[in-house]
Amino acid sequence: MANNTPFAAQPLLTSSELPLTLISLDDWALVTLTGADRVKYLQGQVTADIDALPTDQHVLCAHCDAKGKMWSNLRLFYRGEGLAFIERRSVLDNQLSELKKYAVFSKVVIAAQPDAVLLGVAGTQAKAVLAEVFAELPNADHPVVQQGDSTLLYFSLPAERFLLVTDTEQAQQLVEKLADRAQFNNSKQWLALDIEAGFPIIDTDSSAQFIPQATNIQALNGISFSKGCYTGQEMVARAKYRGANKRALYWLAGSANRAPAVGEDLEWQLGENWRRTGSVLAAITLSDGTVWVQAVLNNDLAADSVLRVRDDAESVLTIQPLPYSLTEDK
């Protein structure tokens, strides 16, 4: 298979409906950091404590500007001799140039890896099928496993699924193995699962717009409040200790004539009136016509609030429960 050639689009399904599915993650990109200073350098750039990251764990953290606004969020893990992270392809070039700004002063090489193949495996029997190909699989206790040139990541949300970072040869083997047994789909299916999981999606139109807490990164254990300095730390800390953050990530579901675009606001019902509010991070339409929206909204929104897509009077969107708690330890 060609590198990151997307599979044909299929109807999108919820995690509970999904049959065995191999997903081309062409909307995501891989970056690696190698060199003696890789950990030290990244420690000064992202919200997670890289010094404390075990080699068998991955973390969703944020890379911020000096004002604490996220250039991107990063799914960070060890791969081979270095560190690696996955982010949305749309923000890759800009985020990478920001991350590299001070790299000339350190022994670190930061590089996109366009030849790497990213695949998702989800749905019924995903684990059993991968066990036929790989000697060891990641799990809830050890969510990162290295095998040869492949790195496997385990996710429990919204249901058991796997992300594979590999080369063209191994990817082709998996494609052939699953040819008669699995549905193939493109990145939109993985996006749907991320929305269901409450994992924030940062694309170009939402880059440098939000502090990490506005997208629930703290609830996903992606912010260390005890590590040393990193870019944007002061603003991120202020949001926690001074209550400066008034927003949160929400998963909305319902009916609409269209899926709203990234960066659009929504309309919130107040009695007989509608008020514009929030900002859309991602939206998809499922096979049954249901629209899912991931949006940043006021964090004091009542659970029974009714929203709609802007200028769509027939639209009705309601708040769905996220599979994790937003209650913070004080």
From Swiss-Prot:
Its main location: cytoplasm. Signal peptide: none annotated. Folate-binding protein involved in regulating the level of ATP-DnaA and in the modification of some tRNAs. It is probably a key factor in regulatory networks that act via tRNA modification, such as initiation of chromosomal replication. Gene3D superfamilies: 2.40.30.160, 3.30.70.1630, Aminomethyltransferase beta-barrel domains (3.30.70.1400). GO terms for biological process: iron-sulfur cluster assembly; RNA modification; tRNA processing. Folate binds at residues 28, 190. PANTHER family: TRANSFERASE CAF17, MITOCHONDRIAL-RELATED. This is tRNA-modifying protein YgfZ. GO terms for cellular component: cytoplasm. NCBIfam families: PRK09559.1, ygfZ_signature. Belongs to the tRNA-modifying YgfZ family. One of its GO terms (molecular function) is folic acid binding. It is found in: Cytoplasm. It comes from Yersinia enterocolitica serotype O:8 / biotype 1B (strain NCTC 13174 / 8081). It comes from the Bacteria. The keyword Transmembrane helix does not apply. Pfam families: GCV_T, YgfZ_barrel. The keyword tRNA processing applies. Keywords: Cytoplasm, Folate-binding, tRNA processing.
